[in-house]
Swiss-Prot record:
Its cofactor is Mg(2+). It comes from the Bacteria. Keywords: Cell inner membrane, Cell membrane, Cobalamin biosynthesis, Magnesium, Membrane, Transferase, Transmembrane, Transmembrane helix. Joins adenosylcobinamide-GDP and alpha-ribazole to generate adenosylcobalamin (Ado-cobalamin). Also synthesizes adenosylcobalamin 5'-phosphate from adenosylcobinamide-GDP and alpha-ribazole 5'-phosphate. Pathway: Cofactor biosynthesis; adenosylcobalamin biosynthesis; adenosylcobalamin from cob(II)yrinate a,c-diamide: step 7/7. It catalyses: alpha-ribazole + adenosylcob(III)inamide-GDP = adenosylcob(III)alamin + GMP + H(+); alpha-ribazole 5'-phosphate + adenosylcob(III)inamide-GDP = adenosylcob(III)alamin 5'-phosphate + GMP + H(+). Its main location: membrane. One of its GO terms (biological process) is cobalamin biosynthetic process. This is Adenosylcobinamide-GDP ribazoletransferase. It is a multi-pass membrane protein. It is an enzyme of class 2 (transferase). It comes from Shewanella denitrificans (strain OS217 / ATCC BAA-1090 / DSM 15013). Belongs to the CobS family. The gene is cobS.
Length: 262
């Protein structure tokens, strides 16, 4: 009975993560309270893998009848539809806050504003354009290269973003609250399971590309931690979204520059 309960609990956590990050339907029996959401971080990478697979499938089918650039764009649209633009919205809010605010309080206040500012619009447009161009270049090399890019980037970017909650403080609009650090409610097992999904997709790449991508993402994670601390003293949900977007671009860049799937 205990093994069955554990299996059902893990399945529940995966569906909680899926429901949080995507607009995909989840079973009605799923329990999605705050505690389950915090524990579901272990499966954020697997949700990224699922999103990457959906984008890859859309690209694979459309590239057989449509030009490469159009097929890539449709795959990107599919990704936005699946997630509801969840991470893109957070990236825009972060850009508005970090670039438009002068003080700690100003940055957080701007980030909480639902209106899109000029900084957010510019950064979002550049990220989307760069993502499209990089994926087109991968697709022109071979369809398999683009498929690999979708799967690897969507998975690893969410692993990196989720890993930040284990080492950076959570920030509210008033002060740093030690008791609200999500990492206090998570264990090393959560981190190991999260990282395992990232290691799994690295096997889609050849040895050199996998090694360089691992080192590059580790360095990016270090820089993001320092940058978030310098800007607002920690992280918010929006900054995690920004981390996901930036690290996704990093994945495409490394795969294109260093090497493609074996």
């Amino acid at each position: 009975m205990s093994n069955e309960y554990n299996w059902l609990r893990q399945l529940n956590l995966f569906f909680v993560a899926t429901g949080f990050f995507t607009r995909l339907p989840t079973p009605s029996w799923v329990i999605a309270d705050d505690n389950e959401l915090k524990k579901s971080s272990r499966y954020f990478g697997l949700v990224g893998l699922l999103i990457g697979l959906i984008c890859a499938l859309v690209y694979w089918f459309t590239q057989q009848w449509l030009p490469t650039s159009v097929a890539v764009l449709l795959a990107m649209v599919a990704g936005v539809l699946v997630t509801g633009g969840f991470h893109e919205d957070g990236l825009a809010d972060t850009a508005d806050g970090f670039l438009g605010g002068k003080t700690f309080e100003d940055k957080l206040r701007i980030m909480k504003d639902n209106h899109l500012g000029s900084y957010g619009a510019i950064v979002l447009a550049l990220i989307l354009l760069l993502r499209w161009q990089l994926l087109v270049e991968l697709a022109l090399f071979s369809p398999w290269a683009a498929i690999t890019g979708f799967i690897v980037a969507h998975t690893l970017s969410r692993v990196l973003a989720a890993s930040l909650i284990f080492s950076v403080k959570y920030v509210t609009d008033l002060e740093l609250e030690e008791g609200k650090r999500l990492s206090h409610d998570q264990s090393l097992n959560d981190l190991f399971i999260l990282l395992a999904s990232g290691i799994f997709v690295l096997f889609w790449l050849n040895g050199l590309a996998a090694f360089v991508l691992f080192i590059s993402l580790w360095a990016l994670r270090f820089c993001l931690c320092k940058y978030f601390r310098s800007q607002i003293g920690g992280y918010t949900g929006d900054t995690l979204d920004a981390a996901q977007q930036v690290s996704e671009i990093m994945c495409y860049l490394i795969i294109l520059a260093v090497g493609l799937s074996a």
